[in-house]
Amino acid sequence: MRKNFLLLALSFCFATASLAQADSLMNMLNDVPAENEAATATFKATRIIDGSSVENLALGVLDFRIDHRFGDINDVKNFFGIDNATTKLALDYGITKWLMVGLGHGVFNKEDDGFVKIKVLKQKKTGMPVTVSYVGSMSIQTTPAPSLPAGDTWLFSNRLYYTNQILIARKFSDAFSLQIMPTIVHYNLVDSTKFSNNTIAIGIGGRIKVSKRIAVTGEYYYRVTNADMLVNGQTTYNSLSVGVDIETGGHVFQLMLTNSQGITERTFIGQTTDSWAKGNIHLGFNISRVFTIVKPKEFRDGKGSW
């Protein structure tokens, strides 16, 4: 647990650095020279929809994110989901070309979370068919402690959740990329002893480019364990999302339809309580805006323009 808190502290220190000039997201995910032969821009953002993609921020780049999910579009009493929308604000930072960290706060269940993403392998034209990354995250639910029977104690550890993922992606062409995400989500507290504290899931996500700046995306998480898990007595379902990515200069705008209102891995992978089959769908969007905090050495030396 101590290591996880150190991770959150490190993420916060980098995320609160002073902002420098804005730069185009195209530079962040720009194609490398052909002789490098490494695949780039497998996805145009560090998230496919809810879940992480294999993309990393460049060294010294800060990404300010606003993730927003409306309530159930069939909920007339809450003005078709507008009145009970949820939002998450996040700051991600590229420490090196292969390491990035992030810290966020979400309205849904008043949740704070942090993560680290490490790029392990890069897809190349020969020798390496896929890009592989690791993502480790933890979240803290800060809602008030529930009322308990006399003699029972509410522990701080009940608020903690952990996620470990391996991201395996392949860019088949400039127009098509696919990613699979073996995942384990650990819940320190579950509704009943009949449920495991570990939810194992397999995610799959993809991107189809339809124009220079627009792509269609999809994401699905199948739970191998805890498929019948209850959350506050409610049935849970596998998370399914479809979306559109629109790249406009310094930011990527992601518009989606999903049955998951939660935005962290804890919520959308294992605790989605809405179903597409029942028409419980949420409209949502992500906005990503990047800022260059530290210029690469070659640009500081006048060998290029950032």
Task: Briefly describe each language-model feature range.
Residues 21-153, 160-164, 169-180, 184-188, ...:
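Transmembrane beta-barrel domains of Gram-negative outer membranes and organellar outer membranes
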Residues 180-225:
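A mid-sequence, solvent-exposed acidic-amphipathic segment
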Residues 7-16:
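Bacterial N-terminal signal peptides
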